[in-house]
């Protein structure tokens, strides 16, 4: 026979009871008709008191594919303790993730962006199916961060995001290195600059711990976004994965989620147009990944807010570049955390008018209130004051022109030349271009065009890090340009333009250009043009024929049927604007 809840459990419940009258979990825990449902919960060792408490989903992207996510399950246990300490009942589950570092440079990368949607969808379905009342989501690698945040906004139950933390930098012959150095070493190896032994030494030194790629690549960019947009507790996204102090943030997040339930503070109270502008600001200020221009519109879409690539680019235009972070700069995420963390960056941006201070956050306070006690650290040079930036305009720039009517994006952090013009050399897949690069079958001054790699045409909008890193390793990173309707890794550097839209697969201009057409890129004025008249482009469009891909079934085929333009975030469903009811209000 089941025993009544012990006195200690009853005392915890009596301390602060949250009514389930309007919470989703009432559908599985309250009333005689739910006796079978409660029976399942008893089977897992829950007490009557625990069943009567709010049920909090604790979702992680844990797997053994890569170091990015390997610590998430351990961290989730601490979150659960925080939930329980605050009179909630945590229910842990995992979702999938595809790690770009493993998927890079081959067909596996077609799964990467697709996984963002699968993560959001799977978290939604798990929460819906079990009627959980709130969500604490832990994520590590690139697409898992936006995927988890998209799920939070879509479900609109009280939610807190936790980043698993960055990897520690490796050490190679007295200097810090990251996985970016390994990719570039492959290019050096291909031209004989380094030998097999040195390549092996670099690959074995670059990644010494658990955690996501250590520089301001996509994962750390989106982690910075999570704090700036208000979904993560201050400082929580900066502490590296191996640091035991992460448990303070994990426990606090578990406690705080119960406060958000009590106050009914939801993600769509936090994710406003102003909050999205704050997120775009920190991306540009840190020279962050161009992938943010894909993920921010997707997060906005879940809230029913129109915030596309051009809106992101508008913020980029007026934001100073102030964080000296790799790949364009000198430092890694660990260095910024030890200098003062993401709040140090946000404080100087706020003080100089670049952030909206009145945005609500998961602390229950506004961004400005969170920053009240953040003091400037004069004894560091990782983050510059916003009035004394590295460059006056942001580290990422939006482009538009007859080659990209729906826009394109380029990271200019660390670049000295912001204009480029040259003849096109066209490739219809990344593999074709990578082979040409490794064989040195290209010329200085050319614009390498990789097309049919967009969201629909790839399918999956692959990243091109293997190709760009090989160019850099060959010493050609600043001597050629590369444009694509696909994406670039946050680790990419050089004159590399991604997200060109419309993509080739739907008849966009990038699919019409030919070898030798002169392409001009101007990252100062934000233009990208091909020297062809409108009539010539129209004539070529008449002879263009759509292509089929190798994916005629399965998850990637299904993705290609529904995915939209990169301009709007490459989303696959109508979004919050078309919603007729919200899960949180079932």
From Swiss-Prot:
Active site: 489 (proton acceptor)
InterPro entries assigned to the protein according to its UniProt record, in alphabetical order: DHAD_IlvD/Edd, Dihydro-acid_dehy_C, DihydroxyA_deHydtase, DiOHA_6PGluconate_deHydtase_CS, ILV_EDD_C, ILV_EDD_N, IlvD/EDD_N
Subunit structure: Homodimer.
Binding site for Mg(2+): 100, 142-143, 463
Co-factor binding comment: Binds 1 [2Fe-2S] cluster per subunit. This cluster acts as a Lewis acid cofactor.
Binding site for [2Fe-2S] cluster: 68, 141, 213
Catalysed conversion reaction: (2R)-2,3-dihydroxy-3-methylbutanoate = 3-methyl-2-oxobutanoate + H2O; (2R,3R)-2,3-dihydroxy-3-methylpentanoate = (S)-3-methyl-2-oxopentanoate + H2O
Gene Ontology biological process: isoleucine biosynthetic process; L-valine biosynthetic process
Keywords: 2Fe-2S, Amino-acid biosynthesis, Branched-chain amino acid biosynthesis, Iron, Iron-sulfur, Lyase, Magnesium, Metal-binding
Cofactor(s) in the UniProt record: [2Fe-2S] cluster; Mg(2+)
Keyword match Cell membrane: no
Stated family: Belongs to the IlvD/Edd family.
Residue(s) carrying N6-carboxylysine: 143
Keyword Nucleus (UniProt): no
EC number: 4.2.1.9
Record Pfam families: ILV_EDD_C, ILVD_EDD_N
Coiled-coil residues: none
Name of the protein: Dihydroxy-acid dehydratase 2
Pathway assigned to this chain's UniProt record: Amino-acid biosynthesis; L-isoleucine biosynthesis; L-isoleucine from 2-oxobutanoate: step 3/4; Amino-acid biosynthesis; L-valine biosynthesis; L-valine from pyruvate: step 3/4
Main function: Functions in the biosynthesis of branched-chain amino acids. Catalyzes the dehydration of (2R,3R)-2,3-dihydroxy-3-methylpentanoate (2,3-dihydroxy-3-methylvalerate) into 2-oxo-3-methylpentanoate (2-oxo-3-methylvalerate) and of (2R)-2,3-dihydroxy-3-methylbutanoate (2,3-dihydroxyisovalerate) into 2-oxo-3-methylbutanoate (2-oxoisovalerate), the penultimate precursor to L-isoleucine and L-valine, respectively.
